[in-house]
């Protein structure tokens, strides 16, 4: 059976464009993905004789939607009016894929063939550290980002690790927290970096500095390793992908805001993050089943039993089951958020 497409896989098109796969909901003949790098005359990322520039400076719904303008002007075939989600998304048809990059395969290649530069050497020692500290296997890990496509630059590139499966993620998450707390091999943000992180995000989210400090205190999936920024990205296994394209249809119904109590946060580690909720209170007096966030900042920050405030797009969902959900960080959800109350 073919391996299913997964969040954080990368795709190179016949034109040399590089897209990043988003989530797990993909049409049979294409991949839902956003444009990340394009060949250019000038840029910081280089592979062979090809120079790339990054068209999305950071992942945010506004930045993703800005890439649609680039595609509309030159590559309209990569814009798809999705009949399941009832929105326009960027998507790469299978027939236009020159190369499909999988994080686990790339890490396995580096481990097998040896590191080719100082950044890859750091990657190998970091993976060995996690393996030794947690007991997970190499097959539970992968590497995405510029290392995946061999466009990285050791002088400034980050390490973006993928953690495969909920079980491995839960094991690694605890150990990362413990190691960071000991301030040893994995270092957390210092006070200055934490303040800068919060200040920067007050510009993009309707949240206060104090709201963001609380969120930052819950985030575990980042660290510095030997002075290199490292991010950790949980990825579903094939067996954990339980929705096929067309099982449900999603109907946007406008903006909604309110409060709710988290009943289950176990699937909030993935992208999209899914929070099951109860006791919802909105101006529309609706029963809402879940909050679904494509904004990674809101992943795994809420616990069962906690009360949260939210703002996003109300979606009516029909299919195997019928329910309401709130979309955060997706198309049309500018200004959406989740915060603890």
Residue positions per predicted region:
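Catalytic core of pol beta-like nucleotidyltransferases
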Residues: 1-143, 147-156, 164-341
